[in-house]
UniProtKB/Swiss-Prot annotation:
Membrane-crossing residue ranges in chain numbering: none
Keyword tags: Glycolysis, Oxidoreductase, Thiamine pyrophosphate
Biased composition range(s): Basic and acidic residues: 925-936
Keyword Membrane: no
Catalytic activity entry: N(6)-[(R)-lipoyl]-L-lysyl-[protein] + 2-oxoglutarate + H(+) = N(6)-[(R)-S(8)-succinyldihydrolipoyl]-L-lysyl-[protein] + CO2
Cofactor(s) needed by this chain: thiamine diphosphate
Protein's job: E1 component of the 2-oxoglutarate dehydrogenase (OGDH) complex which catalyzes the decarboxylation of 2-oxoglutarate, the first step in the conversion of 2-oxoglutarate to succinyl-CoA and CO(2).
Protein name per its UniProtKB record: 2-oxoglutarate dehydrogenase E1 component
GO CC term, one of those recorded: cytosol
Keyword Oxidoreductase attributed: yes
Originating species: Bacillus pumilus (strain SAFR-032)
A Pfam family this chain is assigned to: Transket_pyr
Length: 944
């Protein structure tokens, strides 16, 4: 509506009489010092420009044009009154359905501004409300119009929005009256039908499944027609993907009525009855289940919809655990993925009109959970913005038993959004027409400005936090009011009947039809007694694990890719020291030099792009690399211009994205997970600055990445790079907490690797890329190196890239001995393996009693590879597991039972490493060095 409604420019002709003299005086002040006048007047004068010279002459000729100081004060007071109504009117709006608000007149009486009605009546309308409807004929009508506009069951906050164009558009949209035009009768009756479905569905569940948790929507029933309207308006404008994130409050109702999940399936989930045969055969709705499953109010769904013009769109409600707001960045990531075309080299082509993100927040969770602020911070960042998200706070004014004054330090649940200059609308959930107006403003603002918008939908909670909870024990007065309060369906029906838009007979027919449909659906649900509950087995592709895949790349292909990776425009000035480092890479394929870690990564990326697989990589400092190792984005030392060689590859067949992320682990890894789930063909990589900081995103590891497929059937091939290794840098820069990933390792849910060579890194990345669209795909966690990035013992021959493949276990290079003499097998993983290798090569005493191997893939446990080594060592006495982490950390707790299971009879399994500790590492580098030397020495010293 509003995008085509162009505002008429202001003209000096609108000012006359005493007011003209006053305005000219203010304009003179403005010319001398723009800051001496009100911000809104500055905007007006910016638009008006200088007044016509004849106007100044005319005003000087007229005796009655002399403006007294009293008149000036009157006009200034009216301007102040108008601005106060806009800025503070929300404080007295009727947005709380359970409380009658004070009249706005009491908040802004004319006498407090030194004004009378006659004073205000003579002020030009354009000074008070330049966008007022045409029927407004004088100043007092304009003020009353503002009062009525800003004191309704909908109120507005946008004083914190600093952009003049946005503020101007918002005020025009609100004050023009277009927003509040009466909707067609059939539209309003349709909303009533929807509210009837919402209410009767909840009431049926309440009486049929007594005491079962469902987290009812009642009190915020309007959420469903609000979502209907957002989706309808967006699809009409050409949006083809709508992604919704929400917690469990009201989820079942949204699933049933917005996503079209059949009542029968939801009822069967309450009865724990079989429901596979209840899924619609036409496939209009996608419902995924894992093998362990999840409670019904965590599940999501997909739906294909069409509008009247046959425009099609995919609507998705994402799966979400009870970690309420942690779905937020996942929705943002999936929306960004839906907006991007990744089939051409360079950055993906983004079209923000293709997809819309809708986030439904809780009033306690929005200010209470930090992930919300982290997600809002992504909204204007080039690597993460989605052209605006529509936020809805499902505000029932309570969090479990905690009231708002106990759960936030702000007046409104929405106040956090002000820091990000997001316009806010507060709306009474008992007024569906006001709710539709809020949606209209939100959709048009997002379309016009490509920014976020927030609707604070204020209602109440009819029952307790869940249906087994009695809320009157903690909120007796509140729930006395709730019990007496009519439902929104009945309030709205009474209104429509009184306006002659709905007859009582039509109302009863609609209610009866809905009740019949619900009852018929219930009768289709099989009885729980008719089936035997059985545990669901893992899908065969998951249980079988990864098949062997060829990840080698021909020599000539790699050589050409390498040449292009170290090429840049002739007039591009690469920083001198970096230029010398990069130029050395040219000799790898000519002078028989070895491949170091970052070159192995770059070659892997280049070859993956050649294969047609898009890549997206983000993380703190990921463009350069925390340790200055990567340098995928070059900066001209003279101009600062950027150059990305991976964007210029002649044979690239897919896009490459790399972005430095904000200083946030949670929102960023959530975003990347969402991107990967929506775009499974893309190799999505998140890199921690140090692995130690990854636990700031622990919720995503625990609830989504490790368990999402088992719970929801939600596949992911996300790659996580966690710099890890003990180098004397203390407890914040040593450990990626390998033990936590291994603790969650089961059912082939992810790969956990701790690598020691560039070739291994090259091959595991290529393997992951090749598996992306296969059923066997799983996330990949790599403990990446720091000091090993440039360690000679982590370098690889080019032949290892052209001929080899990823090896779950590597035997120590240079082992030459009689296997029958070996009494100890030393197993380790990651950096300590290189420490052991360095010491081993320096040993002068006999080594024939030792055999050494590196476990590169910790999970899934490479039993076959280790058994193959054990089969050669016929006189083995002990298996030693060496690690640099404390005994209660690292891989020992995970790997010990595996080693004992495969160890030959009478072969001991022993631990060498740091003792059990509460902190990951020593803070003193001297103590670290001494301890590290002991660990390596003990591993290579024969027991007497």
């Amino acid at each position: 509506m509003f995008q085509n409604d162009v505002k008429q420019p202001l003209s000096w002709e609108e000012f006359h009489g005493p007011n003209l003299g006053y305005v000219l005086e203010l304009y003179d002040q403005y010319v001398q010092d723009p800051t001496s006048v009100d911000e809104d007047l500055r905007g007006i004068f910016d638009e008006l420009g200088a007044p016509p010279s004849e106007m100044k002459e005319e005003i000087g000729k007229k005796e009655n044009s002399v403006v007294t100081s009293e008149q000036i004060q009157k006009i200034a007071s009216v301007v102040k009154l108008a601005e106060d109504i806009r800025t503070y009117g929300h404080l007295n709006a009727s947005v709380n359905p359970l409380r009658k608000e004070k009249e706005l007149q009491e908040l802004f009486p004319l006498k407090e501004y030194g004004l009378t009605e006659e004073d205000v009546k003579n002020i030009p309308i354009s000074i008070i409300s330049p966008d007022a409807p045409k029927h407004i004929s004088n100043g007092i009508e304009a003020i009353n119009h503002l009062r009525n506009t800003y004191k309704r069951t909908i109120s507005f906050e946008f004083d914190h929005v600093h952009d003049f164009e946005e503020r101007n558009w918002l005020s025009k949209s609100i004050e023009s009256g277009e927003l509040f035009k009466k909707k067609p009768a059939d539209k309003l009756v349709s909303v009533f039908k929807r509210l009837t479905e919402v209410e009767q569905f909840e009431q049926f569940l309440h009486k049929t499944f007594v005491g079962q948790k469902r987290f009812s929507i009642e009190g915020l029933d309007a959420l469903v027609p609000v979502l209907d309207e957002i989706i309808s308006e967006s699809v009409t404008q050409g949006t083809s993907n709508i992604n919704i994130g929400m917690a469990h409050r009201g989820r079942l109702n949204v699933l049933a009525h917005v996503l079209g999940k059949p009542y029968e399936i939801i009822f069967s989930e309450f009865q724990h009855a079989p429901n596979k045969e209840l899924v619609p055969s036409e496939g209009s709705i996608g419902i995924s289940y894992g093998w362990t499953g999840d409670v019904k109010y965590h599940l999501g769904a997909d739906r294909q919809i069409k509008d009247e013009d046959t425009k099609s769109a995919r609507v998705t409600l994402a799966n979400n655990p009870s970690h309420l707001e942690f779905i937020d960045p996942i929705i943002e990531g999936s929306t960004r993925a839906a907006q991007e075309l990744r089939t051409q080299k360079g950055y993906p082509a983004q079209d923000v009109e293709k997809a819309l993100a809708i986030l439904i927040h809780g009033d306690a969770a929005f200010p209470g959970e930090g992930i919300v602020a982290e997600t809002l911070n992504l909204s204007q960042l080039v690597g993460y913005q989605v052209g605006g998200t529509i936020h809805i706070i499902a505000n029932n004014m309570i969090g479990f038993t905690t009231e708002s004054n106990e759960s936030r330090s702000t007046k409104y649940a929405s106040d956090l959004a002000k820091g990000f200059e997001i316009p806010i609308v507060h709306v009474n959930a008992d007024d569906p027409e006001a709710c539709l107006a809020a949606v209209q403003l939100a959709v048009e603002y997002r379309k016009r400005f490509k920014k976020d918008f927030l609707i604070d939908l204020i209602g109440y909670r009819r029952y307790g936090h869940n249906e087994m909870d009695e809320p009157s024990t903690t909120q007796p007065m509140l729930y006395d009011a709730v019990r007496k309060h009519k439902t929104v369906k009945n309030i709205f029906a009474d209104k429509l009947v009184s306006e002659g838009l709905l007859t009582k007979e039509q109302r009863e027919e609609i209610e009866q039809a809905v009740a019949t449909r619900i009852e018929e659906a219930y009768q289709k649900v099989p009885s729980k007694k008719e089936h035997t509950i059985q545990e669901i087995e893992l899908p065969e592709p998951v249980s079988n694990g990864f098949p062997a895949v060829d990840t080698s790349v021909e020599f000539d292909v790699l050589r050409k890719l390498n040449e292009e990776l170290i090429s840049w425009p002739d007039d591009f000035q690469v920083f001198g020291k970096l230029k010398r480092i990069l130029e050395k890479r040219a000799k790898v394929f000519t002078d028989d030099r070895k491949v170091e870690w970052s070159l192995g990564e770059a070659l892997a990326f280049a070859s993956i792009l050649k294969d047609g697989t898009p890549i997206r990589m983000t993380g703190q400092d990921s463009e350069r690399g925390t340790f200055a190792q990567r340098n995928l984005v070059l900066h001209d030392s003279q101009t600062g211009n950027e150059f990305i060689a991976l964007h210029e590859l002649s044979d690239a067949n897919a896009s490459f994205t790399v972005h430095n992320s904000p200083l946030s682990e949670g929102s960023v890894i959530g975003f990347e997970y969402g991107y990967n789930v929506y775009s499974p063909e893309t190799l999505v990589i998140w890199e921690a600055q140090f692995g130690d900081f990854a636990n700031a995103a622990q919720v995503y590891f625990d609830q989504f990445i490790s368990a999402g497929r088992a719970k929801w059937g939600q596949k992911s091939g996300l790659v996580m790079l966690l710099p890890h290794g003990y180098e004397g840098q203390g407890p914040e820069h040593s450990s990626g907490r390998t033990e936590r990933f291994l603790q969650s390792a089961a059912e082939n849910n992810w790969t956990v690797a701790n690598l020691t060579s560039a070739a291994q890194y090259f091959h595991i990345l290529r393997r992951q890329a090749k598996m992306l669209l296969r059923e066997e795909i799983r996330p990949l966690v790599i403990m990446t190196p720091k000091s090993l990035l440039r360690n000679p013992n982590s370098l690889s021959e080019v032949q290892e890239l052209t001929d080899g493949q990823f090896q779950p276990v590597l035997e120590q290079p240079g082992l030459v001995h009689d296997h029958e003499k070996v009494s100890r097998l030393v197993l380790s993983s990651g950096k300590v393996s290189i420490d052991i290798s360095d010491r081993f090569t320096q040993m002068e005493e006999p080594k024939d009693w030792l055999h050494i191997a590196r476990v590169e893939q910790l999970y899934p446990f490479p039993a076959k590879d280790i058994k193959a080594i054990l089969s050669k060592l016929t006189n083995l006495e002990e298996i030693v597991w060496t690690q640099e982490e404390p005994q209660n950390m690292g891989a020992w707790g995970y790997i010990e039972p595996y080693l004992r299971e495969i160890a030959p009879e009478k072969v001991k399994v022993r631990y060498i490493g740091r003792r059990r500790r509460s902190s990951t590492a020593e803070g003193d580098p001297t103590v670290h060095k001494k301890e590290q030397e002991r660990i390596v020495s003990d591993s290579l010293t024969r027991k007497n």
